[in-house]
Amino acid sequence: MALSTFGAIMGYAAEIIKQTEEAYQGLISKAKNSTLKQALQDLAGEEKKNQSLMERTRRENVTEMILEPITGLHQEEYIVDLKGVPQKDDTDLVKVAMILEERVKRFFSDASAKVPLPEVARTFRKVSQKREENLGKLQGLRLHQPLK
């Protein structure tokens, strides 16, 4: 489905954040390593804050919505199917978390370039940049700490 209006983009932004938070909750229950568990709890907490941020951003910018159609964003490009991704051990869980972070980073980066409202674009860029930081932290967990 094309995300061709400000409302559709904000709705999908809220949805993708909610899905990611729910996925993190599932990963937390599977994590064995306490450092990984804490990292996943931090990421889930961040998602709750991002949900509030998206609601506030939508509310504050609704009067400035530009009715000009937005092109080039499609929901299908940001769908990830985690059913086929192994989740047997902590290393697998880190990989899943990285897939989730990459997905959200890509969406917010792409959306920031398409949204015609500077305030919203700036918010989206910040969310995308934070995802890049999160990926670095997860990469560090996966490479430099024993996870079992």
Set out the residue ranges of the language-model regions.
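Acidic/histidine-rich alpha-helical segments that form the ligand environment
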Residues: 13, 20-27, 78-116
